[in-house]
Amino acid sequence: MNDEGSTATGRRSPLAKVLSALPPGTQLVIGGTVLLGAASYAHLMAAGYSLSKPNMASVSLLWTILMSVGLGLFFPVEQELTRIVAARVVGGQGVAPVLRRTLVITATMLVVLTGGMAVAVRPLADTFFDGRTDMVLALAAAFVAMAAGNVTRGVLAGLGRFGAYGTQLAVDGALRIAIALGCALGHVRSPLVFALILTAAPLVAVLVTLRPLLSSVRPGPQVAWSALTSGLAPLVASTLLSQVVVNAAVVSTQLLAPDNAALVAGLLNAVVLARVPLFVFGSLQASLLAGLSSTAAAGDRAGFSKLLGRTCVVVTVLGLAGGIPATILGPWLIQVLFKADDVLGSLDFLWMSAGTLCYMLAMVLGQALLVLHRHRLQLLGWALGTVALIVTTLVPGPIATRVCLAYTLGSLTAVVCMFAAVRLTFLREPPAAQSGADQSARPSLVDTV
């Protein structure tokens, strides 16, 4: 019996070995991430079948701007908060001062962001939402909800409360699915209602997990403002630029062809479909980052290089597994799943799928640079990728082809730059020379949908 048990244990699949090595509750985080990712598809499918093309285009643009600007601004707050809280927990210090000052920083960011939107409400409404100022207000509310979720998840992850973290993701996803399907079955035709789902669901999820968060927050020594802000600026800039690269296609199309609502909506559907591999990769990213950080901290050059290479292989397989079916079936699938018009071809999906593969590779290499404390080199890679995207978008030609190809070339440029940066950094000094590299491993998981 014991021999058989040992044999069975030794023959576990690689995925089972990875899951067993994760901290308690992390599997719930993965489950919550999966549910939240599925919610994006359900939300957009319900909107696609319920709304007119112009109204669906407005929802598509709001979703894209939220995923670009919102994630770019507030996900870095979650990352830095997780890192600092986790360090305090290890040192036996309370995290209440960290939470208070992070709330001040986040509130300041929200005031600047929403204040700017209030000043420019009319131009924003005319440019993106067919003149509807209520959609601008819905976008501002969604920014507030996203910020609340990122701050609370940052603290929960740093405290090791992965069960509550996963619960927040799961509640958010379940509510988005339930409300969106309810709106579709109830024949709701208002884009505002579908937009407000992005505010209501995450706020309820935050309230559900507020009690375990507050019960774990203890008083402690004050934290310096510089400790919270020193790494935040380059991280925010890098994340914003990376979100520009991955989400620019929809906004670029709206700016280049404001009267083509069908193309705007169809491109969002294509982006969501082509990003399925990115969504899968995001649910496993934290464990991969932890491995890179531990090998770097131990000075294990061979282990660091081997793990980074294997991660790139896994990402490539994911990209091909999702990209080939998307290229072949994508034009048909977006019509069936999202009720999109016949506005995109297989070549467009080929570029989108290739862009997703390159984008995932850039994410892996960018995280390696963070582990090696090369934040500015990561920022440089995304900056050059954004330049390549803009240049390609402005080249004459069919709009759909330009914006899809721009995604590919922008991501490819970032990959090449970051590969060179990792290579040069790794040759100059071993990972062990990077003191505190293990702090770059963050227990919170990333939403790519």
What would you call each of these model-derived segments?
Residues 53, 121-139, 261-264, 327-357:
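Interfacial segments at transmembrane-helix termini and the short loops linking adjacent helices
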Residues 2-6, 20-78, 233-256, 448:
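Signature of the first transmembrane helix
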Residues 133-137, 166-215, 384-388, 400-426:
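Hydrophobic alpha-helical transmembrane segments
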Residues 74-90, 270-273, 278-299, 370-371:
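Helix-loop junctions and terminal segments of transmembrane helices
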Residues 24-36, 62, 74-122, 300-323:
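Membrane-water interface segments that mark the loop-to-transmembrane alpha-helix transition
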Residues 145-167, 350-381:
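Membrane-interface junctions at transmembrane-helix termini in multi-pass inner-membrane proteins
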Residues 2-22, 163-166, 187, 191-197, ...:
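Interhelical loop/hinge segments that connect adjacent transmembrane helices in multipass membrane
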Residues 25-41, 172, 176, 197-209, ...:
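Transmembrane helical elements of multi-pass membrane transporters/channels
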